[in-house]
C-alpha cells in the first residue's frame, strides 16, 4: 500500500493497458461468427461504454426497473428460483439498494405511480418485477458518500450492490472473499448491458466512502 500515482503516472498506466490490448497477433486469429445466435449479444457488448455524462431528462420508472432488474431480478424455474446472475453454491449473498436522485414518472398505465427521489432497498418480485422498499427520502448525505460527487450531476440514480458474506464463508471459507465480489461483478455487468440496450448512459464506480455510504443506506 502507498500513495496513489500522480496524473502523469496514471496516464502511463492507461497507455500501457492500451498497448497490451493491441499487442495480440492478427495472424491465425479466429473470427467471430457474424451470423451466429450470439450476434445480438456481441453487438450489445461492443456498444457498452463507461459514460459519465447524463442528459437532463428523467428516466421513466419501467425503463429504470428493467435496468435494475437485470442485476436484482429473479427467474422462477420449474424446480427452483434463481437470480439473473450466477451465484456460487446458489447462496445468493448480494443485496441491492437504489438511490433515486430525482423523481421518475410513470410511462404508462402499467406503472401506477411515479418513483420519488429517495433511498430504496430493492427486492425481486415474480414475473419480472421489483419492489422498491423506501428507506429515506433525505438525499443530503448522497454527495458525501462518493469520492467524486460530480458524477452524480444529472444522473438518474445509483445502484449500490452490497453482500452478506456469512453463508458463503460458512461453505467456502476464505474463498468467499473471491466468490462474492465476482458475483457482484456479474450483477453490475448485467445492469450496464441493460443500460446500453436501453440507450442510457451508465458507469461503474468504486470511489465511495464506506461509512458515509452505509449511513445513506441505513446500514
Where on the chain are the PLM-derived regions?
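A glycine-rich helix N-cap at a beta->alpha junction
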Residues: 217-219
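N-terminal amphipathic, basic helical "cap/leader" segment at the start of enzyme domains
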Residues: 1-154
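Small-aliphatic-rich amphipathic alpha-helix that forms the alpha element of a beta-alpha
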Residues: 48, 67, 96, 157-168, ...
Amino acid at each position: 500500500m502507498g500513495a496513489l500515482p500522480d496524473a502523469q503516472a496514471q496516464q502511463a498506466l492507461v497507455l500501457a493497458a492500451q498497448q497490451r490490448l493491441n499487442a495480440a497477433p492478427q495472424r491465425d486469429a479466429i473470427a467471430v461468427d457474424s451470423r451466429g445466435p450470439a450476434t445480438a449479444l456481441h453487438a450489445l457488448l461492443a456498444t457498452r461504454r463507461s459514460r459519465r455524462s447524463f442528459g437532463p431528462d428523467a428516466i421513466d420508472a419501467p425503463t429504470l426497473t428493467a435496468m435494475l432488474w437485470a442485476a436484482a431480478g429473479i427467474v422462477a424455474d420449474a424446480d427452483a428460483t434463481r437470480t439473473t446472475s450466477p451465484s456460487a453454491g446458489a447462496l445468493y449473498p448480494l443485496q441491492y439498494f437504489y438511490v433515486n436522485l430525482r423523481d421518475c414518472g410513470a410511462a404508462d398505465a402499467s406503472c401506477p405511480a411515479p418513483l420519488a427521489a429517495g433511498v430504496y432497498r430493492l427486492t425481486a418480485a415474480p414475473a419480472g418485477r421489483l419492489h422498491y422498499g423506501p428507506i429515506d427520502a433525505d438525499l443530503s448525505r448522497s454527495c458525501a458518500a462518493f469520492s467524486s460527487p460530480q458524477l452524480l450531476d444529472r444522473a438518474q440514480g445509483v445502484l449500490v450492490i452490497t453482500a452478506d458474506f456469512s453463508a458463503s464463508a460458512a461453505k467456502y471459507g476464505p474463498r468467499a472473499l473471491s466468490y462474492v465480489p465476482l458475483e457482484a461483478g456479474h450483477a453490475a455487468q448485467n445492469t450496464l448491458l441493460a443500460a446500453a440496450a436501453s440507450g442510457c448512459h451508465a458507469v461503474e464506480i468504486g470511489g465511495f466512502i464506506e461509512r458515509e455510504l452505509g449511513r445513506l443506506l441505513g446500514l
